[in-house]
Structure formats: structure tokens, C-alpha cells
A protein has these predicted regions:
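A short, conserved structural fragment
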Residues: 154-164
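Short amphipathic alpha-helical interaction segments
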Residues: 140-155
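Residue-level detector of family-conserved "landmark" positions at structurally sensitive sites
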Residues: 43, 146, 163-164
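Accessory beta->alpha helical hairpin/"wing" motif in late/C-terminal subdomains of nucleic-acid enzymes
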Residues: 162-176
């Protein structure tokens, strides 16, 4: 659990259980949801078959999205770069900056060297992982460039790798 700044949880932090208790609670939750027909398809999401959140799947597949409105985030792939943007967080600042023609408060260009990490950080949240072709289409890089690191993670029991799919193992889902 991450207690985000500027939230009620950060202001009034609850007492959190110890590691083993957390693991036991997670296993109990997963078992109960599985018994009700819900699969843990993503690190923090459960759904019945065919009911997964398509909006979030786009994030985890490193797809593009355009955020509109105060505090909204975007990820945009252009022909020569990938950008992450954040609109002005506070509505009054957002409106003022829209009028001035500067709706973006922060913009980060993701360098080509950072794309493998960005992609894997998202795609390995999914229990089903991703096909290697998706990596190549979303990063414009060959999977061979990261294959040694993927094979090392497989040797550590964190990934299952086949020609069709790269996915976290149950152990990998706990630690990746």
C-alpha cells in the first residue's frame, strides 16, 4: 500500500499490518474473488472474463491516451518521440493557462533508452503479460535488445517466456 501525499490516508495514516499478515490477507482476498468468478488480471485489478477495464488495459499495453481537464495526464507517441504530459492540476490554474494557450504544466520526453523500462513497468502488471510483437510495435525496438535481461528474470523464476508471450510468474507478480 502506498499512502499518497495530499490524501486523507497520508494525513491520517492507518495502522498497517506486518508483511506476513498482508500476504495472508492478499491470498485470502484472491481466493474469495476467484471463488466468485473474478480473476486477478492486473496487479491491482480483478474482473470476470471479458469484463476487464479496456481503458486501463490501454495503459498497461503502453498505448496512447490524451488527458483533458485539470490534472489530466497524457502519453503520446509521435513519429520521433514519446511524451508524458500533465495538465495544470488546480481548476483555476488550468482555466487560466488554457486561455493563455499553455494547458500543459509538465512534459517529459521519454528517451529511446528509457522505453524498455517504461513498457515493461506497465505490461508486466498484467497476469497474461504481452506478446513480443507488442513490445516491438510500442517501442520501435527489437525484443532482442532486452532478451538477456528477460532471460535472467526467467532464470530467477520471475518470468515465463515463450515465442508468443512474456508474462510474470506468480512469484514475479509478487516482486516485479
Amino acid at each position: 500500500v502506498t499512502l499518497e501525499p495530499n490524501t486523507r490516508f497520508a494525513a491520517f495514516p492507518p495502522e498497517l499490518p506486518e508483511g506476513d499478515t498482508c500476504a495472508d490477507m492478499q491470498e485470502a482476498i484472491e481466493a474469495r474473488l476467484a471463488g466468485a468468478g473474478f480473476a486477478n488480471y492486473e496487479t491491482s485489478a480483478f474482473a470476470q472474463t471479458g469484463k476487464q477495464c479496456r481503458h486501463n488495459l490501454n495503459y498497461w499495453h503502453f498505448g496512447d491516451y490524451l488527458g483533458i481537464g485539470a490534472g489530466a495526464h497524457s502519453k503520446l507517441t509521435l513519429h520521433d518521440r514519446v511524451l508524458r504530459q500533465m495538465r495544470w492540476k488546480h481548476p483555476s490554474a488550468y482555466l487560466q493557462n488554457i486561455r493563455a494557450g499553455t494547458p500543459v504544466q509538465e512534459e517529459t520526453r521519454i528517451a529511446a533508452a528509457g522505453l524498455p523500462f517504461e513498457f515493461l513497468m506497465n505490461a508486466l502488471r498484467l497476469a497474461d503479460g504481452f506478446p513480443p510483437a507488442l513490445y516491438e510495435s510500442r517501442t520501435a525496438q527489437s525484443i532482442n535488445g532486452i532478451l538477456p535481461r528477460l532471460l535472467a528474470a526467467q532464470a530467477d523464476g520471475l518470468l515465463a517466456i515463450s515465442p508468443e508471450r512474456i508474462a510474470p510468474t506468480l512469484r514475479g507478480r509478487r516482486f516485479l
